[in-house]
Regions:
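Small-residue-enriched hydrophobic alpha-helices in membranes
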Residues: 1-49, 56-229
Length: 229
């Protein structure tokens, strides 16, 4: 059963009058949520709220989501249904973000980083980065408790084209080479596609993990080269 079929089933479980935000409560109530379904719905739902925030609700949303997910033509309707439900839902994006953070729990920080990374991919899909999108993503990061270097790293990578290598590895610029190496090894493990899938990243979005792994390795190469100079 494809993830898009499972998402359709999750949406169908909503009772009449319930908004899409109730999906997150339903998944959380199951004890161990189907994390890949939850992740996918979360990215599309927050992506829809972000599109509404900048007023560009028709700016090629399917094409934008393809920067994160592999979406077969036959499953575009399922992705579009989630997008439209979120766009029409009266609940604010902050209510979504709070429910999403609660759903993944305290151990879900890496999933939330993946999610924010995906939203940056969507925000920059049209070649522009609007002030409203910037404010939106900053607020989501605050709700997710992804402060400081983590947020700066993602923003710099997607908007400026290059992130500070110390931010990428979650380090202060004064960190020793030994600490940088340890942080790099830890980040490589966390960014491995198999580990990412185990924590909830759907295989359809594996390019996020691959992109993150490249960024982590590039950061270590940059730091080690600077120290060797």
């Amino acid at each position: 059963m494809s993830i898009w079929t499972r998402i359709t089933a999750a949406i169908a479980s909503l009772t009449q009058g319930q908004g899409l935000a109730a999906v997150f409560d339903n998944l959380r109530a199951n004890g161990t949520p189907e994390k890949s379904v939850a992740f996918t719905i979360a990215v599309i739902a927050l992506g829809a709220k972000m599109a509404k925030a900048d007023g560009q609700v028709t700016k090629g949303e399917v094409a934008a989501f393809r920067r994160v997910f592999t979406i077969p033509r036959k499953d575009e309707a399922a992705a579009g249904r989630v997008f439209n439900l979120a766009r029409q839902d009266l609940a604010g994006f902050d209510a979504y973000a709070i429910k999403i953070k609660a759903m993944f729990g305290e151990a879900g920080r890496e999933v939330l980083i993946d999610l924010l990374d995906g939203l940056f991919h969507i925000a920059t899909a049209d070649g522009e980065f609007h002030p409203a999108e910037d404010a939106f993503l900053y607020e989501v990061a605050q709700i997710f408790d992804l402060h400081g270097g983590c947020y700066r790293s993602l923003r710099a990578k997607h908007v400026d084209g290059k992130a500070d290598p110390y931010d990428v590895l979650g380090l202060d610029a004064s960190a020793s080479l030994q600490d940088a190496r340890a942080a790099w090894r830890k980040a490589v493990k966390e960014s491995h596609p198999d580990i990412a899938i185990a924590r909830g990243l759907p295989p359809e979005a594996i390019r996020l993990a691959e992109d993150r792994l490249r960024a982590v390795n590039a950061a270590w190469e940059d730091i080690s080269a600077r120290r060797a100079a």
